[in-house]
């Protein structure tokens, strides 16, 4: 089997898009199987930037089939807006397939997302207000509307009417809102979407399964990151899906034994968006410098990301829960110009040293980083394409990460463009 899963191994925003785009040029099939358009990643090809939220990264390769799997919560309006971006540049989108089992996001999901976040007050969790959580709630409550329902206008009308009646009761009685959702408006809007996406809809599980069985190269594209996983992340400051390797198989509609390699995407430092404890966060000039040099602002929200030093406790945890077989080390060039670079090797909580990532956020908030300090480098590394040509201190930094995490670094990124990538092992080989 030639199947590779790409997993964000921190809090997301690690640079997955670049790695996925790089590997997508070799892949026959690219699959997204969790989350929705709350996640964003940017592809840079020949100086042109494409901000993707729903569409898999293989769309730029006309020979690659791009799957939006059953584990996705699908915003048809957002999807069609992304399509326009490619049509403007005359890029074909005929290679996209949408699972008929994917659940659909509606306006009431987005409104309830915003109302719920507002009602939390000081306990807000930092939602993107894209309706992701409420849509997954309907899914687990077994009242959600799927793509296959949307394709049948009569069945869709019955299900939508029931949902709008229920959501209007919530909006009116819990949140005290007088402006309610109108069935006819939403029904007609989504019938229009249904006709526009109909040609893309398929049983994508069959497509992925057949591709794997045929020995084709299949790339599973993760969104967000391990520490945002609903079960394994920094709960409750997490997403509503499973952006870990275990969730990818379910979201693609195949068995877990069909994913051979799991590549962890890891930044050379650490960032986070939203609320929650962040042990190595630098609320100082160091954090500001990382943010400015790394252009650390969210693709989807534009929010400035919180920045800090590399945290080996986090990445070692990600290696364990994902079964990482390889690491792609991203944004190494951002650390150029730092005299000293710190790496968090463990946590100190009271008089105890902790090497495993704690479940309790109260415990995590009490933790202080235990750092090992390494010498930095000043040389420009953005044009280097051979690992041996990196500055000695940069190579030592990568070696230290491998030592602490216990997984080999097989790819190193030294700039945003596809060409600015150092390959130490061909992951699809």
Curated annotation (Swiss-Prot):
Native source species: Clostridioides difficile (strain 630)
Keywords, in A-Z order: Cytoplasm, GTP-binding, Ligase, Magnesium, Metal-binding, Nucleotide-binding, Purine biosynthesis
Function: Plays an important role in the de novo pathway of purine nucleotide biosynthesis. Catalyzes the first committed step in the biosynthesis of AMP from IMP.
Residues annotated as binding Mg(2+): 13, 40
Chain sites annotated for binding IMP: 13-16, 38-41, 128, 142, 224, 239, 303
Any one GO CC term of the record: cytoplasm
Protein name in the entry: Adenylosuccinate synthetase
Taxonomic lineage from the root: Bacteria, Bacillati, Bacillota, Clostridia, Peptostreptococcales
Residue sites binding substrate per the record: 299-305
Subcellular location: Cytoplasm
Subunit structure: Homodimer.
């Amino acid at each position: 089997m030639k199947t590779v899963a790409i997993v964000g191994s921190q809090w997301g925003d690690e640079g997955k898009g670049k790695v996925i785009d790089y590997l997508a040029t070799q892949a026959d099939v690219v699959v997204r199987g969790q989350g929705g358009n709350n996640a964003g990643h940017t592809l840079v090809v020949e100086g042109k930037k494409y901000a993707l939220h729903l569409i898999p990264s293989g769309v730029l390769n006309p020979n690659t089939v791009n799957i939006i799997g059953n584990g996705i919560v699908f915003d048809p309006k957002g999807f069609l807006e992304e399509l326009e971006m490619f049509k403007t540049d005359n890029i074909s989108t005929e290679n996209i397939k949408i699972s008929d089992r994917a659940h659909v996001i509606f306006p009431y999901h987005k409104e309830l997302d915003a109302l719920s976040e507002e009602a939390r007050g000081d306990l807000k969790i930092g939602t993107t207000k894209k309706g992701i959580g409420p849509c997954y709630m309907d899914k687990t409550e077994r009242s959600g509307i799927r793509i296959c329902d949307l394709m049948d206008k009569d069945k869709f009308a019955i299900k939508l009417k029931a949902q709008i009646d229920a959501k209007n009761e919530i909006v009116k009685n819990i949140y005290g809102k007088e402006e309610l959702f109108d069935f006819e408006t939403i029904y007609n809007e989504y019938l229009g979407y249904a006709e526009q996406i109909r040609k893309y809809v398929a049983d994508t599980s069959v497509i992925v399964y057949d591709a794997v069985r045929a020995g084709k190269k299949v790339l599973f594209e993760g969104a967000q990151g391990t520490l945002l996983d609903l079960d394994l992340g920094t709960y409750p400051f997490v997403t509503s899906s499973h952006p870990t390797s275990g969730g990818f198989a379910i979201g693609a509609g195949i068995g877990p034994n069909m994913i051979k390699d799991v590549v962890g995407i890891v930044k050379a430092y650490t960032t986070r968006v939203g609320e929650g404890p962040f042990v190595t966060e630098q609320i100082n000039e160091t954090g500001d410098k990382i943010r400015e040099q790394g252009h650390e602002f969210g693709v989807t929200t534009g929010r400035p990301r919180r920045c800090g030093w590399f945290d080996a406790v986090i990445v070692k945890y990600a290696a364990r829960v994902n079964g990482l077989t390889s690491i792609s080390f991203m944004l190494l060039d951002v650390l150029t110009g730092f005299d000293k670079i710190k790496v968090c090797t463990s946590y100190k909580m009271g008089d105890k040293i902790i090497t495993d990532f704690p479940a309790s956020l109260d415990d995590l908030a009490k933790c202080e980083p235990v750092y090992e300090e390494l010498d930095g480098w000043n040389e420009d590394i953005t044009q280097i394409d051979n690992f041996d040509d990196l500055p000695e201190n940069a190579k030592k930094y990568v070696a230290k990460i491998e030592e602490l995490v216990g997984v080999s670094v097989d790819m190193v990124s030294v700039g945003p463009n596809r060409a600015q990538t150092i390959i130490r092992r061909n992951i699809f080989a």
